[in-house]
């Protein structure tokens, strides 16, 4: 029996420090009104206490809400309530949508129409353990220096923002994620 191949639509990766972007703006990283760098206190005011919390490495946490037949996962910059949103994922049929209206169940064609791009093959994702297909777009990298509170030093590297739409074998969206990452150089 052939295993179905999980498909990722790696839609847009935005490299930015000072608002430089292309087809997607940082402000477009918004799922059901939750956006990048929003105060976690605002998320708690809207959704209440999380159903469960996973702690991040080395700092931060992921607040998980069970909504309908799916999950809303909100990553925070700190284990404290005063943290800010660093990423959001919706998995399954939550009824939630990206700012553009794309939601779980949308077709890959709809996503491409809104954001552009094409499907490409990538090597296996560690968690999925199989090859993935995705759409990607990126812009020029900008560098910055930031203070790393965990390690206690200034770090030179780059920030980037990413928005991924994961697809099933029928090219329907099954998961949506956005986040910010920082990589040292």
Regions found by a protein language model. Give the residues of each.
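Positively charged n-region of N-terminal signal peptides that target proteins for export
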Residues: 1-4
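Boundary at the C-terminal end of the N-terminal hydrophobic targeting segment
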Residues: 21-25
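Bacterial N-terminal signal peptides
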Residues: 8-16
């Amino acid at each position: 029996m052939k295993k179905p191949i999980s498909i990722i639509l790696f839609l847009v990766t935005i490299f930015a420090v000072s608002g430089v972007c292309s087809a997607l703006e940082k402000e477009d990283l918004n799922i059901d009104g939750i956006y990048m760098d929003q105060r976690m206190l605002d998320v708690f005011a809207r959704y209440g206490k999380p159903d469960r919390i996973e702690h991040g490495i080395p700092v931060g946490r992921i607040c998980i809400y069970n909504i309908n037949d799916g999950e809303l996962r909100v990553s925070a910059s700190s284990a404290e309530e005063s943290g800010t949103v660093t990423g959001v994922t919706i998995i399954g049929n939550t009824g939630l949508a990206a700012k553009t209206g794309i939601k779980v169940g949308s077709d890959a064609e709809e996503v491409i129409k809104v954001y552009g791009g094409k499907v490409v093959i990538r090597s296996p994702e560690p968690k999925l353990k199989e090859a993935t297909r995705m759409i990607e777009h990126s812009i020029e990298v900008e560098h910055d220096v930031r203070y790393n509170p965990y390690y206690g030093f200034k770090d030179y590297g780059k920030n980037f923002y990413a928005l991924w739409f994961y697809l099933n074998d029928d090219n329907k969206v099954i998961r949506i994620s956005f986040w910010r990452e920082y990589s040292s150089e």
